[in-house]
Each structure stands twice: as C-alpha cells, then as structure tokens.
Swiss-Prot record:
PROSITE patterns: PPASE (PS00387). The lineage of its organism: Archaea, Nanobdellota, Candidatus Nanoarchaeia, Nanoarchaeales, Nanoarchaeaceae. It catalyses: diphosphate + H2O = 2 phosphate + H(+). The keyword Repeat does not apply. Substrate binds at residues 16, 28, 40, 126. This is Inorganic pyrophosphatase. Belongs to the PPase family.
Amino acid sequence: MEVYAFIEVPKGSNVKYEYEDGKLKVDRILYGAMFYPYNYGFIPETLEEDGDPLDVLVITEEPLVPGSYIKVKPIGVLVTEDEKGVDRKIIAVPVKKVDPIYGEIEDISELKEGIKLKIKHFFERYKELEPGKFVKVKEFLGKEEAEKIIKQAQENYKKQ
C-alpha cells in the first residue's frame, strides 16, 4: 500500500503546526525540551474516530518542509492513549523511489530498536508539562494492522 502524507511538523522541530482551513498554523510550541524525532503530519482523505485525519510519522534522515506531500508506505502503527482517548499514529517510510535507504523497509519489525525507542520516548513525554494533558504509549503494531487502519479511515472519510 502506498499513500501520500501531508507534513505539518518537520523532524527536529519543537513547534507543533496544524493544517486548518487551507492554512498551516502554529498550534503550540512544545512545553518541554522535546523535539519531533521524525516528520509528523496526516494522511489526507482519512478520518479517525476523533474527527481528525489519521496521524502519520514519516521516518527520514532529513526534515521535510511543512506543507509538503510525500508518497509513503505504512510499516506499522503506534497505539497511544491521551486525554481524549485512543490515538493511533501510522509509522511510515518514503517509497523507495523517494528514499532508497528507508524505502527498503517493509515492516516496523525491520526498524532498528533505537528508532522505536526514540519514537516511544517522544510520545510518552512531549505533553508531560502541559496542564491536563497526558499520553500513554500502548504498543507498536505491524504493517498489516496499519493498512487495515488506513483503509477504515479512508472509508470513514468517504461516508462523511
């Protein structure tokens, strides 16, 4: 499966941007000394149970420009729970034509353990200093589950 990801936050940023009404706006500057370990955004034309598009974390060596689209393939999903309920984040890599290194990865099980630890650590801590907010990391799931979640979110989008 290949989909496009819309990048809101570049790798290495501590500024949380959100795309709203056709514009990229600053949502907030992260409260703690944290920065996004990889590029973060959403998969267009998807809808999660929380009413937002499906979140995606795109693993690359380089930060991508906010507002850009990149063709990716899902390799897994990070399941978290926050103050609003279950929050799933698709973990994706660019397709091989775009990134010949990460493009070879097919499943989250192929990611180096250090990459998964970095992702887990970030999402466990990035809301820690924000009043009334929290995140609990539940588990990583593989490519098949990620693809099921994307297909369901695409169906949800079509039904709205």
